[in-house]
Amino acid sequence: MKAVTAYLRSLNPRLPRAVWLIEAGGVANSLGNGIVLPFLIIYLHEVRHFGLATSGLVVSALGGVGLVSGPLAGRVVDRIGARTTLMGSLALLAAGYGGFPFVRHPWQALVLAAVAGFGNGGFAPGHSSLLASLTSREQRTAAYSLQRATDNLGFGVGGLAGGLIATTRVPSSFTLLFALDAGTFLAFIVLLAFVPAPRAVPAAIRATGRYATVLRDRAFIWLMVVVAVLVAAAYAQISTVLPPFVKEHAAVSEAGIGVIFFVNTVVIVAAQLPLAKALEGRRRMRTLALAGSIFAATCLAVLATGLWLDSTAAVVVLCAVIAVFSLGECLHGAVQNPLVADLAPEHLLGRYMAVRTIAWQLGFMVGPALGTLLLARSPAALWLAAAGACAAAAVGSLLLEGRIPLVAARTPRATRVPSKAFRVEWRTVTMPLDDPLSTGAKPSPHQASEASPLRGGGRRTT
């Protein structure tokens, strides 16, 4: 029992108070996203009576504008700071989503989608950069892992809450959804008011920041290629193409699909921090290669399930498959953002995070488009191609390992702060050198001067 208790205590990430405030805001934000995003097309199509194509265009505009505004957001982060950028992005998101209840015409929805899209474009670079700025290298893996776990928890709970609130029979129920979503963004802004601004980079150094410098970092750019491939071939296929595939080929109901994705949420929430802990001291690119290998295997397992099983048996097997896939997500999540933060020079952190966001957005733009095209022609080709792409990304991760700087090659071991025991510090009375009774001997050093550097040092930020 003591061993179990000690292990659970070791999972405590021991993060600064400011980081916990950001994580709390992240929970609120993901809760709001879960409340609205799954029901946005339903609202536009069935409540506002827009065509399906028009409704889809509005949702696509959210991602498209975010893709365009992402590079600008990276510059803004490096110029005025991550916290200010994040607060501005949240204000745009609140205004954009908060205005949807007043939509009556498609052009109004597109305008609001553009406003929210600009907010989306700035949110991820601002959020990720702020976490990196307020943590040391040793704390970042835990901070980003906690963010991933809480985001999944918030989105899952939000989706459940949204499903219980929204009904097309009562159009005003969607007004409540959008109001709650806007409220979560505003709540995050309030929490950020209590987060100290990170140490500013000197203006002379900030002025030298260019995207050209980022693009010349070949190791980082190839890392982003690997990330984009994994997002397109794994994340996008599982989140968008898996549901229609298993519904058509394995007779899995909507309820069964919901159970499968609930397993995904539970596993990530439960396993992210323990896996991050287990990865301390491990090579990051090998961990990323392992994640790619897991994604490849699960794509093949999804194909086999669709071909050979159906109904309840398919749901049971797919739950196990998605549980394994979720472990791959945890491995990927424990490596990606901390590695990007460690590769980025301090004055280019926002730009590096913006490029990372663009890699994800490109993956989610290309993945569903290619996936649905292949699904219509040959489901087997879809999942075989996805598995092959994930395997190629795994090999690419191993080939890239030699290009990663040694200081960033391994996941740092978390700094362990010993528990504070009661201690009396004896103070030695020493005589001044100019005292007439002095023998001329030098004063002895204070005992505290040889104490652990943890005493009185402050948290190091990078």
Outline where the language-model segments fall.
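C-terminal membrane-cytosol helix-exit motif in multi-pass small-molecule transporters
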Residues: 163, 183-201, 396-401
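Structural signature of the two symmetry-related core transmembrane helices
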Residues: 84-99, 182, 287-303
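Helix-to-loop junctions at the C-terminal end of transmembrane segments
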Residues: 69-81, 270-285, 375
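C-terminal transmembrane helical hairpin of 12-TM major facilitator-type secondary transporters
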Residues: 287-332
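Cytoplasmic helix-loop-helix junction between adjacent transmembrane helices
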Residues: 112-153
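Conserved MFS/SLC helix-loop-helix module at the cytosolic interface between two early adjacent transmembrane helices
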Residues: 67-104
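Juxtamembrane intracellular "pre-TM" segments in multi-pass secondary transporters
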Residues: 1-17, 195-229, 414-435
